[in-house]
Amino acid sequence: MAMTIGDIEKRVRAVLMDDVPPDYRWSEAFILGAIEDGVAFLHSIRPETRYVDGILTDGVKVPQGAKDEEFPVHSRYREAMVAYVAYKCLERDSADTQNLNLAETYLNKAKTLMQV
């Protein structure tokens, strides 16, 4: 079964314990934007991931309401994307020193998983 953008969002929310609607800490728009950033970051580390079904893509735009769309990156990078989006969320909360340290941990995890 194909992974969707909504699957990534759901997993990120579970990791960050932000999965009780409607009181989300991070908005859907922010998380979808972070997914776009994560794909661009993955492409910078692993340029070959820009090929989707043998076709070179120029990046991913995640429009609002696109949660049912198929995630355009190989499933082996799912946890890397989750870690990167968690990093972006916690980085936004960087006034809290603990969150800043945790954000760095997630960024390092994302980088490691992207290089596998």
Question: Where do the language-model regions lie?
Answer:
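Elongated alpha-helical scaffolds
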Residues: 75-84, 88
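Conserved short "hinge" loops at termini or chain/domain junctions
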Residues: 1-70, 92-116
